[in-house]
C-alpha cells in the first residue's frame, strides 16, 4: 500500500509542475495506469467511493483516451456519493454498448425520482436481457461453471452479466431498494 501511495504522490507532484500524460504504448507508463486503476477498483470494492473517485479522476487526467474505461467505475462512484452533477458529466463517456450505462441510468433515475425510468428499463430488458435476468436473480453464485465461463476465450453473455453483478455487488447491498425495484418489474 505504501508503494502505491508513494507512486500516487510522485504523479501528483509531477503533474503540479507540468501537464503529464502517460503514453499507453509505453510499458512502464501503462503499468502505472493499470496500478492506479487497480487501486481505484480495490477502494471501490471496500466502499471507499471518494478515494476511488479521486484515483479515477487522476487516471483520466493521465490517460485522456481512457484506455481502461475508468469513466464507467467513476460514474458508479459518483452515483454512490450522490454527486449528481459530476455523474451527469461523466455518464456521457460511458459507452452505450455496455449494460453498465443502462444500469447507471436506471439507478440514477431511481435515486432522483424514486422510481425506475421506463424507457431505460425497457431498453435494459430488451437489449441486455441476460443482465436484466442476473440483476433480478435471487442468487449470484461464483461457482465453478461461472469461473470456467468467465475465464474462457469467449465468455458467455450470462457470465459477463454475473461478473458485472459481482463487481458492483457492494453497491447493491447498500442500495437494496434499487434492486428490489428492479425485481418488482419481473
Residue spans for each PLM region:
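Structural signature of alpha-solenoid helical repeat junctions
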Residues: 24-31, 48, 66, 97
